[in-house]
Amino acid sequence: VCSSDLGAQQYYHIKPDITTLGKIVGGGMPIGAYGGRREIMQMISPDGPVYQAGTLSGNPVATTAGIETLNILKNDPQIYERLEQKTRKLADAARKAGNGHVCVNQIGSLMSVFFTEQKVRDFESAVTSNTEQYADYFGYLLDRGIYIAPSQFETMFISDAHTEEDIEKTCKLAGEALCSLDF
């Protein structure tokens, strides 16, 4: 749900057999959901032989949070565009400050900064990253009040709660952090 109201399905123009949704469907609460083609979903109880249940299944607090989150997203169709603009601004600033020494991957409101000069498209290219430099980058930002993913192998997420001032401050400090590193 981080790139559009139908997530990667809409972004990449695909129709999957099964869709899984994580915390966003519960407004950040511990919940997940899945759905799929009719013939697959008919295999799930009570219509089919596959039983699915769990401790958190149908948790009223999480489902209420999820309904409210989905209502907010539905009633504000520009939210995805705002998220992408904010994230693109951060990604562009990191690319510029990294001066070819980092690979910044970004889509929608998701981004990652890899400390490698090559494109990162898979695990093999990701592990060429310099984790010590990332740790220094992380520490520089954390010491100045900016919390990013503690590992370059995790995705950073931008929220609509992040203000333009937050984005500007992060761009400035990320640039300083990257310029302080010895590439």
Predicted region positions:
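Conserved N-terminal phosphate-binding loop of PLP-dependent enzymes in the Aspartate aminotransferase
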Residues: 1-183
